[in-house]
């Protein structure tokens, strides 16, 4: 049995989120929380929230033992891009892409 949690439209690029997700993929939940608490990146805060939600889903909806859970899947897909323009010299304007991501975490119980 697996429990899933998704955070959509996170205002952070999927590439930056993916770097932190690589740290917790395959780890036990308690170890993943410890890693995220000491990771100095903004994405760690978002992933911590999603992981807490996934553990709560496993505990309440599926009645799984939280001490035996591990991060089975962790990935960030690209969400819609917000396009903004930055004025530059001589009447030019450069486009700035503000990327968003959908963060998904799946936790399973170890056999």
Curated annotation (Swiss-Prot):
<dbReference type="Pfam" id="PF00237">
    <property type="entry name" value="Ribosomal_L22"/>
</dbReference>
<comment type="function">
    <text>The globular domain of the protein is located near the polypeptide exit tunnel on the outside of the subunit, while an extended beta-hairpin is found that lines the wall of the exit tunnel in the center of the 70S ribosome.</text>
</comment>
<dbReference type="InterPro" id="IPR018260">
    <property type="entry name" value="Ribosomal_uL22_CS"/>
</dbReference>
<comment type="function">
    <text>This protein binds specifically to 23S rRNA; its binding is stimulated by other ribosomal proteins, e.g. L4, L17, and L20. It is important during the early stages of 50S assembly. It makes multiple contacts with different domains of the 23S rRNA in the assembled 50S subunit and ribosome.</text>
</comment>
<keyword id="KW-0689">Ribosomal protein</keyword>
<comment type="subunit">
    <text>Part of the 50S ribosomal subunit.</text>
</comment>
<dbReference type="InterPro" id="IPR005727">
    <property type="entry name" value="Ribosomal_uL22_bac/chlpt-type"/>
</dbReference>
<keyword id="KW-0699">rRNA-binding</keyword>
<dbReference type="GO" id="GO:0019843">
    <property type="term" value="F:rRNA binding"/>
</dbReference>
<comment type="similarity">
    <text>Belongs to the universal ribosomal protein uL22 family.</text>
</comment>
<keyword id="KW-0694">RNA-binding</keyword>
<dbReference type="InterPro" id="IPR036394">
    <property type="entry name" value="Ribosomal_uL22_sf"/>
</dbReference>
<dbReference type="InterPro" id="IPR047867">
    <property type="entry name" value="Ribosomal_uL22_bac/org-type"/>
</dbReference>
<dbReference type="GO" id="GO:0003735">
    <property type="term" value="F:structural constituent of ribosome"/>
</dbReference>
<keyword id="KW-0687">Ribonucleoprotein</keyword>
<dbReference type="GO" id="GO:0022625">
    <property type="term" value="C:cytosolic large ribosomal subunit"/>
</dbReference>
<protein>
    <recommendedName>
        <fullName>Large ribosomal subunit protein uL22</fullName>
    </recommendedName>
</protein>
<dbReference type="InterPro" id="IPR001063">
    <property type="entry name" value="Ribosomal_uL22"/>
</dbReference>
<dbReference type="GO" id="GO:0006412">
    <property type="term" value="P:translation"/>
</dbReference>
């Amino acid at each position: 049995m697996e429990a899933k949690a998704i955070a959509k439209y996170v205002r952070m690029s999927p590439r930056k989120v993916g770097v932190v997700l690589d740290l917790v993929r395959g780890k036990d939940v308690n170890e993943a929380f410890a890693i995220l608490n000491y990771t100095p990146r903004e994405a760690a805060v978002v992933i911590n929230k999603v992981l807490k939600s996934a553990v709560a889903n496993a505990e309440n909806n599926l009645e799984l033992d939280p001490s035996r859970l591990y991060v089975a899947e962790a990935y960030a897909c690209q969400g819609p891009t917000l396009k903004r323009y930055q004025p530059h010299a001589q009447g030019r304007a450069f486009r700035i892409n503000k990327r968003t991501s959908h963060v998904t975490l799946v936790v399973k119980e170890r056999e």
